[in-house]
């Protein structure tokens, strides 16, 4: 029975990682193509010295022909090039302010990958203090309940991106970086509620002779989630309305959340018995 409970946890974990791991795929694409990455002039020297900046020249060049959603256009089944401005300026509302040939300083797309680790360091002690405070008041949720909270909070992060798409008119104008940063902040809180608790429950619920096996199962679930994340991200260009893509992510996380809610009493009982 304990092993069966572990399987239940691993199932919802797969769906969580499938969404979370899109920080290296869909969210990076959103940062590159749909996010305003202009660096304020006052910060540009420091950003350059730290290697956080890239230069984009506002001048026409030979570029791939793309539609409004940055999908390559084809002629006779083959992509083709046109004489136009770089992709970054396709949905930049400020192009009228740029002199021809101007060099803009932009935040590297890769910088957004560091947001999650930054928030992990920032939020971890705060969450520990919060749960310790609840424990002293006798109101600390169970490990399974924390995982459920983590799934729900993570789902909210995808709603942030839905609003970002609406705010930017489905990418016709660039959205503020604050949307992406907020989404990372929210899903990091969800990660800190779910990942440590899930790993702890899997190890504690498994019989001693299966402990190593179930720890391997956790890694396998993470791996499957990574694969599913890639499958989802591969279909990014299928969605003309990018809000629908993030609604799909929201739906998958809420599915995992409701699955866990249904199993919550059984998991809490098994954990208490253990």
Report each predicted region and the residues it spans.
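Disordered extramembrane loops and terminal tails of multipass alpha-helical membrane proteins
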Residues: 1-184, 188, 195-199, 205, ...
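Conserved short cytoplasmic inter-helical helices of the MFS fold
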Residues: 209-213
């Amino acid at each position: 029975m304990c092993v069966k409970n572990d399987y239940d946890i691993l199932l919802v974990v797969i769906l969580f990682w499938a969404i979370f791991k899109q920080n290296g795929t869909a969210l990076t694409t959103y940062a590159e193509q749909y996010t305003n990455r202009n660096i304020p002039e006052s910060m540009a020297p420091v950003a350059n010295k730290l290697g956080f900046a890239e230069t984009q020249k506002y001048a026409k060049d030979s570029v791939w022909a793309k539609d409004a959603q940055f999908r390559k256009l084809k002629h006779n089944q083959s992509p083709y090039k046109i004489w136009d401005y770089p992709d970054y300026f396709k949905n930049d509302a400020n192009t009228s302010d740029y002199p021809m040939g101007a060099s803009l300083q932009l935040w590297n797309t890769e910088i957004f990958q560091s947001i999650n680790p930054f928030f992990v360091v920032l939020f971890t002690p705060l969450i520990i203090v919060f749960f310790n405070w609840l424990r002293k008041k006798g109101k600390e949720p169970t490990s399974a309940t924390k995982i459920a909270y983590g799934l729900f909070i993570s789902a909210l992060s995808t709603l942030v991106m839905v609003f970002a798409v609406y705010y930017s008119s489905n990418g016709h104008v660039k959205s503020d970086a604050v949307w992406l940063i907020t989404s990372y902040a929210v899903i990091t809180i969800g990660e800190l509620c779910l990942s440590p608790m899930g790993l702890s429950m899997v190890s504690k619920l498994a019989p001693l002779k299966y402990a190593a096996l179930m720890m391997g199962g956790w890694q396998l679930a993470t791996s499957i989630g990574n694969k599913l994340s890639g499958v989802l991200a591969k279909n990014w260009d299928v969605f003309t309305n990018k809000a629908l893509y993030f609604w799909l992510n929201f739906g998958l996380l809420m599915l995992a959340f409701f699955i866990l809610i249904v199993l919550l009493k059984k998991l809490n009982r098994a954990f208490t018995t253990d």
